[in-house]
Structure formats: structure tokens, C-alpha cells
């Protein structure tokens, strides 16, 4: 039996644009994901978040499912344009009402809310002013954060400033695969810097407004292994770790400087006097959230812009084509403790997409997802034994949902959503996870 510590928080996670639908209802403004998904060619099959899981209308049923599974915590995000349709200025009371109902219902059921302030749905009106590339966004984000802290901070004590800022900056502004769909390396690295400035200002406002809460930030992580013991391959893996994983942001937050290999590559793309902001960026945070899905083998490649390329391995993969490397979650957890020693750590997302089908009996037998989750939770347990101050684990995701540029083609839920009828079916993995929570650990 692999028992977890007393009070360990087992949770499920979602994000606003991925599940809510009704993006313009009740006075909400447009987000960049609304405009991006409505532009032909950006999202597979022309899918949009117009309906998604219709959580905007079915939130009560969805919270009942969380309760049925027995999750102790629910991580969800707030849609910025629901609260501030123009991004700043006038507050939309109906947006506040929607999230107030969710928060109050969770608390009635003894489910701890974890709120993500920004999970990628920037108000479109702010994108028209340059979005994350505009230095002023740090103040816009602080203003938005203040509205949330003042309205919800009396009841919500766990806050996340940003979800996966690397994805916001790089996938949205360098690869152009996510909103706002830009491909400009200067804009991308100015965005990295402005995300850090915005995060720091939000933390500062939090300290003034929410006296007894905790605030942190969430990063995407892959486990990068070198293809050989050659020095240049090891360096390639180190670069990818610094650039793709938590160090890109935690090094500034804890040490006031970007990681060495990132600076070597990107110094010319950062704002000219970026150092002047570093003191302000060094705000103490209460926890670090880590998302983990996959591992990658990398090698030195003189022909690639960053001198790195991926080496495909003969490993099992998920429906996303991501290699399944459970021990990677252990090494990421160990790494963050050794490199930055945060007070508390959470796994804020871990999960997998598979091609789920509903059986004739109306069940979803997703043994592959159970195997994936079990293997990763075992490694998480191992990290706790080795002294990582891990306080909770969140499965991505509660529901099948809008998987960004992949649209509805990829299912990550432990609950199946039939998008034609909006019927929810708890998958075998949902029942399995419910048992893990009940036992506070793995029995087999």
C-alpha cells in the first residue's frame, strides 16, 4: 500500500474557455481564444469554445460529479473577459455572480477551490492594445487580480497567477499555434518578461488584499533526457529544461535572473533594460504548481535555431503522440526541490488523452488511462518519500473538453462528454481515481 500524507489534496482540474461555452453570455467580452478559434484554419475541424461542455449552464451537475468522485479540491480558472469585458475598467457583475455560485457550492460540499487567475483567455480588447507584448499589461493584470481578490478572497484561499506562461509566450507568440497566433521571437520573449512582471504585481496585490491565503504559479514541464553522454547532447537537454520547464520563470522569481543557457540564446530578444525589473519580479510565492504529461529525448542539432532536436523513441504514446515517461514526474519534482526548494509543491495537472469509446453498456473502459495515472501517482509517491514537500495532485481533466488547437478531437477527461447531448459518463478511470482518493493512496 502506498499511503499519502494525512490531508493530501486529491483534486481535478479544468479551465474556463475549455469547458464553459457561452463565451459572450451575460455581458462577457470576447477573448483572444474566441476570435482565434473563429478564424478558419486555426483549430482542427473548425471547432470553437462556443458550447464546449456547456459548463456555464451545467456547473451544478459538474460539481455534483466532483463530489461523487470524492475529490477534495477543484482547480478551475476565471475568464478575464467575463469579469472585465474590456479587460480593465467596468466590472461585469453577472460574471462575478457565476463564479460566486461555483465557489459557494464547492465550499458547501467541502471541496477546496483553487483558482487560476489566467488560463489563456485574454480579453480581445487588450490584445488590440498589444496584449502580453505591451508593458502596461502588468498593471492591467494587477487590476484584474484585485477585482478577484476583493470579490472572492474572503472564501478562496488558494490562488494561481498564471497557467503555463511558457505556452502563452512561446506557443502563442513564437509558434503561432495558440492565440493570438503570432510568430515573432522578439514578441515572444517580451511576453515572457511581461508575464513575470504581471505575476509579481498580482502577488503584491494579493499580499495587500488576502491576508490568510496562499498564492503560486503553474508551469508546464517535460522530462528532457540527452540522446547520448556527449557533452553537446547533455547541454541540449539542459537548455530544454531551462527554457521549457520551471527554471525559465523560477530562476527570475527566486534568484532575480534568467537561467544561463536561456540568456545565451535569448538575451537579444529580451527587453533592452530587462534587468531593471528583476528586483520587482523577485516576490516570495507560497507554492509552485507543476504540470507534467510527457518526456522527450533530445540531441544537439547544429541546424536548428536553438541547436536542439527531438529523438523519437519506441515508447508507448498517448493520443496526443506524447511519449509516456512516468519517472519524468519524479525527476521534475526532485529537480524543483533541489534547484529552488519551494515551501510547497502541487502537481496541478497530470493526465492523458486516449481515443475513448462508449461501450454498448454505456460505460467507458479506459484501462490505458488508469495505467497512465497509476504509474505517475506511484512516481509522485516516490518523490514524497524523498522529501519533496508535495501537498496535492490534480488530474487533468475532470471532463473531456476543448483541447485548444486540437479542438474536441482529444479527450483528457476522467468523465466522458457526449458533445451532441452533453451527457456525462464517469469513465472507469474516474471510478478508479475515486478509490485512490478514498484510500488516500494506491492499494495495488
UniProtKB/Swiss-Prot annotation:
Molecular function GO labels: glucan 1,4-beta-glucosidase activity
This protein's UniProt keywords: Carbohydrate metabolism, Cellulose degradation, Glycosidase, Hydrolase, Polysaccharide degradation
Thermal dependence of function as given in the entry: Optimum temperature is 95 degrees Celsius. Is highly thermostable, retaining 85% activity after incubation for 9 hours at 90 degrees Celsius and 88% activity after 1 hour at 95 degrees Celsius.
Domain of life: Bacteria
Any one GO BP annotation for this protein: cellulose catabolic process
Stated regulation of activity: Activated by glucose up to 200 mM when p-nitrophenyl-beta-glucoside is used as the substrate. This activation by end product concentrations may be due to a transglycosylation activity of the enzyme.
PROSITE patterns, per the entry: GLYCOSYL_HYDROL_F1_1 (PS00572), GLYCOSYL_HYDROL_F1_2 (PS00653)
Active site: 164 (proton donor), 349 (nucleophile)
Catalytic reactions on record: Hydrolysis of (1->4)-linkages in (1->4)-beta-D-glucans, to remove successive glucose units; Hydrolysis of terminal, non-reducing beta-D-glucosyl residues with release of beta-D-glucose
Role according to the record: Broad substrate specificity glycosidase. Releases glucose from soluble glucooligomers, with a preference for longer oligomers; acts more readily on cellotetraose than on cellobiose. Displays similar activities towards the disaccharides lactose and cellobiose. Is also able to hydrolyze various aryl-beta-glycosides in vitro.
Subunit structure: Monomer.
Family, as annotated: Belongs to the glycosyl hydrolase 1 family.
NCBIfam families documented for this protein: BGL
The name this protein goes by in its record: 1,4-beta-D-glucan glucohydrolase
Annotated organism of origin: Thermotoga neapolitana (strain ATCC 49049 / DSM 4359 / NBRC 107923 / NS-E)
